[in-house]
Design a protein with these regions (language model features):
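Polytopic alpha-helical membrane-helix bundles and their juxtamembrane interface segments
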Residues: 1-28, 32, 39, 76-81, ...
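A broadly tuned "polar low-complexity/structure-edge" signature
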Residues: 37-40, 45-47, 74
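Core segments of alpha-helical transmembrane spans in multipass integral membrane proteins
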Residues: 34, 59-67, 129-132
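Membrane-water interface of transmembrane alpha-helices
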Residues: 61-80
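Helix-loop junctions on the outward
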Residues: 28-31, 43-61
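Short, flexible micro-motifs
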Residues: 39, 54-57, 69-72, 170
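Gly/Ser/Thr-rich helix-start
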Residues: 19, 37, 52, 67
């Protein structure tokens, strides 16, 4: 038992951080970004050691994006936002739909190419898909768009499967739980958005 725990120590620790992160995201707390810097920095090694090179690269991006997300939530502004008001939860502008889709498709294609050309990944299609959609999801989260939850339910469901296949059981369990929390998070943010308007 202790050997099992020792061999999955990083998986367990980052899973605990992941629970803290999703609960902070659910509450729309700016502190999610601090955890969102630490957890993915540790995940780089976890994913790399399990051959999930795309996810390792994504974890580097998450670490950097955590700094960006904090700055946007702390100092960012939206149209009609009052001075000193916290960045509000809003809908994504329809004019962003097509560029977002095109960015997702380009990121998926580029990441897929990198994985099949430069790594021995056994799941390049799924790994690149979750990476590309995570780029979009994290950007939408940083802008506090309510649609970010839709991106994450897809990412989390696919990652749940990937982590089971790759033998990362605690992360798999975390992502299974994320699927449930994401649904609740959407309704929580929607309620918060209505209350503020």
């Amino acid at each position: 038992m202790m050997d099992y725990i020792a061999s999955h120590g990083l998986d367990i620790f980052t899973t605990v951080l992941g629970l803290v992160y999703i609960l902070l995201e659910y509450r729309a707390s700016i502190w999610l970004w601090l955890v969102g810097i630490i957890m993915p920095a540790l995940d780089v090694w976890l994913y790399w050691s399990h051959g999930l090179y795309g996810d390792a690269g994504m974890a580097v991006y998450y670490t950097i994006a955590g700094i960006y997300g904090y700055a946007v939530w702390k100092y960012g502004k939206k149209h009609n936002q009052k001075e000193k008001e916290e960045l509000p939860i809003t809908y994504m502008k329809k004019s962003l739909y097509l560029p977002t889709l095109l960015f997702f498709l380009a990121a998926w294609g580029i990441t897929y190419y990198i994985l099949i050309t430069f790594t021995n990944s056994t799941v390049p299609l799924q790994d690149s898909f979750t990476n590309a959609l995570s780029f979009v999801g994290l950007w939408a989260l940083a802008r506090k768009y309510i649609e970010q939850w839709f991106f994450w339910i897809i990412v989390d469901a696919v990652c749940f499967y990937l982590y089971i296949v790759k033998g990362i059981p605690f992360k798999a369990g975390l992502y299974g739980l994320y699927v449930i929390i994401v649904v609740a998070g959407y309704f929580k943010w929607k309620k918060m958005m209505i209350k503020k308007s």
